[in-house]
């Protein structure tokens, strides 16, 4: 059971969805957040403005960091993935969306940490059919 002192990891924390999750968690009183992302973009910096958290960890450093620091993590929201449907480099998708997600899952499984994983691009694709969750159009949606 989570309480306000629980430590929560949010991957993709500087992106649109991840930063909204950080805002939501802050509003619920959670501030012991470990933010994981690639923090090299000024727009992402704006997404984190006024957010409360413990530390930011670069995505590629995260597993070395947890091995070294051994934080007591109570929950992981894995929202970090390459969702850009115009990215055609398969190796990037393979690394970020498959291999990295598997490493997150393994980390959580080994350490008995609850995990929530979500990605919207697989449903909405480039958005040519809109961004509706109406069940009538679900069959037409694809990445």
What do the PLM-derived regions correspond to, one by one?
Residues 59-96, 125:
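NAD(P)H-binding glycine-rich loop region in Rossmannoid oxidoreductase-like domains
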Residues 30-31, 110-114:
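A short helix->loop->beta-strand "cap" motif at the edges of active sites that frequently abuts
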Residues 19-21, 44-45, 87-88, 126-128:
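Short glycine-/acidic-enriched loop or helix-start segments at secondary-structure transitions
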Residues 8-28:
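N-terminal Rossmann NAD(P)H-binding glycine-rich loop of SDR-like oxidoreductase domains
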Residues 11, 36, 76-80, 115-121:
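SDR active-site strand-loop-helix element
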């Amino acid at each position: 059971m989570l309480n306000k002192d629980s430590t929560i990891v949010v991957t993709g924390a500087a992106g649109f969805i991840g930063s909204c999750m950080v805002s939501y968690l802050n509003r619920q009183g959670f501030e012991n957040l470990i933010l994981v992302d690639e923090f090299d973009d000024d727009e992402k910096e704006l997404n984190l403005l006024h957010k409360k958290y413990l530390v930011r960890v670069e995505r590629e450093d995260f597993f070395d960091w947890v091995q070294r620091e051994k934080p007591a993590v109570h929950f992981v929201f894995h929202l970090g993935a390459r969702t850009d449907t115009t990215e055609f480099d398969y190796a990037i998708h393979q690394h970020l969306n498959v291999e990295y997600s598997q490493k997150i899952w393994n980390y959580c499984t080994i350490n008995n940490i609850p995990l929530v994983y979500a990605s919207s691009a697989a449903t909405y694709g480039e958005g040519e059919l809109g961004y509706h969750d109406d069940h009538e159009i679900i069959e037409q949606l694809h990445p």
